[in-house]
Amino acid sequence: MTYKSLSIYVRELLGYLIIGLLFPWLWLQGIYLKKVVLRLPTPGDTPFGVLKGNGRTLEILGLGESSMSGVGIAKHSETLTGLTAIRLNQLMDRQVNWKVLAKNGLTIKTLNQLIKEQPSTDTDLILVSIGGNDVFKLTPPWVWGRDLVRCVKLLARGGRKPLILFSPVPCV
């Protein structure tokens, strides 16, 4: 074994040792932060709206976790779904019906359950924001990917062909 390879081995070993020694402190710090971090409310108004326009009605549905539910903002019309509906109404001069179906703490698995419980509708555009809570709950990537495929299949059930847009997984 050369001096250089021994040096790399020792540095790697020291890294694991430091992580092992710091882990209990980091774990306790995480528990403390979870207790003291401010919990922001979701908007208190109705999570749907209708924007008047001409021509065929455009149906928009927003699904997901806290980022989609509007945590920390005053009105659902200021959520990603509400703002998308407003902009499409302005650009296309069509009536837009929009609805937000989102909850704090949802994972891809619980989102799939929520989708199964909803009646099938003729939605034209579905916006999905999911993944942050899966990261916190340490969902394995292969399980997340499998459940994401199930999500798309559930959204397209009954022969529907909505445009489904996924936002990137939030940086956590």
Where are these regions (language model features)?
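Short hydrophobic segments within beta-strands
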Residues: L63-G64, L101, S167
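Extracellular glycan-modifying ectodomains
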Residues: T2-E12, Y16, K103-N104, T110-L114, ...
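Conserved beta-strand elements of the Class I
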Residues: E59-L61, K99, I126-V128
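Alpha-helical cap/lid subdomain in secreted, periplasmic
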Residues: K116-V172
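Catalytic nucleophile-elbow at a beta strand-turn-alpha helix junction centered on a G-D-S/GDSL motif
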Residues: R56-A74
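N-terminal secretory targeting modules
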Residues: M1-L61, L91, T121
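Membrane-embedded segments
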Residues: G72-D124
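Surface-exposed cleft-lining segments at the edges of enzyme active sites
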Residues: G70, V100-I108, G132-V143
